[in-house]
Swiss-Prot record:
GO cellular component, one term: ribonucleoprotein complex
Gene3D superfamilies: Ribosomal protein L33
Family note: Belongs to the bacterial ribosomal protein bL33 family.
Keyword terms of this UniProt record: Ribonucleoprotein, Ribosomal protein
NCBIfam families assigned to the protein according to its UniProt record, in alphabetical order: PRK00504.1, PRK00595.1, rpmG_bact
Family annotation (HAMAP family): Ribosomal_bL33
GO molecular function terms attached to this record: structural constituent of ribosome
PROSITE patterns (UniProt xref): RIBOSOMAL_L33
Name of the protein this chain belongs to: Large ribosomal subunit protein bL33
Gene: rpmG
Biological source species: Thermosynechococcus vestitus (strain NIES-2133 / IAM M-273 / BP-1)
Domain of life: Bacteria
Length: 64
């Protein structure tokens, strides 16, 4: 018998301020990788994490 596909998937979180503010001169965009349960969290994940380019805690959203 084939094993069922797991519920956990690996996702990437990206800083929203680095991406949307082109006037701010930053060397890059902050990205974190984490896992989420596909069955319990169906929508896009949004967490407050530290961005080393903005040098503050910002909202990081899930990207595809």
């Amino acid at each position: 018998m084939a094993k069922a596909k797991g519920a956990r998937i690996i996702i990437t979180l990206e800083c929203t301020e680095c991406r949307t503010n082109p006037a701010q001169r930053s060397p890059g965009v902050s990205r974190y990788t984490t896992t989420k349960n596909r069955r319990t969290t169906t929508g896009r994940l949004e967490l407050k994490k530290f961005c080393r380019y903005c040098n503050k805690h910002t909202i990081h959203r899930e990207i595809k």
